[in-house]
Amino acid sequence: MSVLDLNALNALPKVERILALAETNAQLEKLDAEGRVAWALENLPGNYVLSSSFGIQAAVSLHLVNQIRPDIPVILTDTGYLFPETYQFIDELTDKLKLNLKVYRAAESAAWQEARYGKLWEQGVEGIEKYNEINKVEPMNRALKELNAQTWFAGLRREQSGSRATLPVLAVQRGVFKVLPIIDWDNRTVYQYLQKHGLKYHPLWDQGYLSVGDTHTTRKWEPGMAEEETRFFGLKRECGLHEG
């Protein structure tokens, strides 16, 4: 697998870009998670960044990537509506793993947004998408630009939802390479990794949460629910960061 030309790939239509990466992805599927990170660091351009929502299994990708690339910038888009337990988890992991945390927020405060738009998350799919654009997508785009990122690591897994079921290890998104080292991991593999390295799930895991985002759009799991139904009232799975 050779070094890939980001500018050339960005110039291609999406379908052609996927086809251009197909052979590389076939090889990456054969590597383990650590091998994928190492390959990316050797073959893809820097600067390198890692994004995290500090959700249920966040400790896995944070530990995995940071141990191979210490001091990699870790991007958090903070909406201002995270659970108290999430903010505590962020502090705990930042200290334990010595993370180079970079926090990005919307230009407007949460209170100002509510005054201007009302509670967007109560305004159906259109409102949720506007909320996500303001609080997740724009801050992430700004982070990638300010950090001059060309390669972006993230901890998505195919098992998490239908929208992630066919994601490849390597793609181009928002003009940069995107690498998903643990994309093919199942819940058992996640658990084993956490146990092996003395890491914890998010504190709300023990209270019945399978996925954690903002307080107003996250539900506990109940029998019969798919994991993706615990977010955004079942109307959406993605917050916008991993779409497009």
From Swiss-Prot:
Record's keyword terms, sorted: Cytoplasm, Oxidoreductase
Origin, by domain of life? Bacteria
Question: What S-S linkages are listed for this chain?
Answer: none
Q: Does the keyword NAD apply?
A: no
One Pfam family in the UniProt entry: PAPS_reduct
Localization: Cytoplasm
The keyword Oxidoreductase is annotated on this UniProt entry: yes
Q: Which InterPro entries match?
A: PAPS/APS_Rdtase, PAPS_reduct_dom, PAPS_reductase_CysH, Rossmann-like_a/b/a_fold
Mention any one GO cellular component term assigned to this protein in its UniProt record: cytoplasm
Q: Which residues form the active site?
A: 239
GO terms assigned for molecular function:
phosphoadenylyl-sulfate reductase (thioredoxin) activity
Catalytic reaction list: [thioredoxin]-disulfide + sulfite + adenosine 3',5'-bisphosphate + 2 H(+) = [thioredoxin]-dithiol + 3'-phosphoadenylyl sulfate
Q: What is its EC number?
A: 1.8.4.8
Gene Ontology process terms (BP): hydrogen sulfide biosynthetic process; sulfate assimilation, phosphoadenylyl sulfate reduction by phosphoadenylyl-sulfate reductase (thioredoxin)
- What does the record give as its pathway? Sulfur metabolism; hydrogen sulfide biosynthesis; sulfite from sulfate: step 3/3
Q: Which CDD domains match?
A: PAPS_reductase
Family statement: Belongs to the PAPS reductase family. CysH subfamily.
- The protein's role, per its UniProt record: Catalyzes the formation of sulfite from phosphoadenosine 5'-phosphosulfate (PAPS) using thioredoxin as an electron donor.
Entry protein name: Phosphoadenosine 5'-phosphosulfate reductase
Q: Which organism is it from?
A: Klebsiella pneumoniae subsp. pneumoniae (strain ATCC 700721 / MGH 78578)
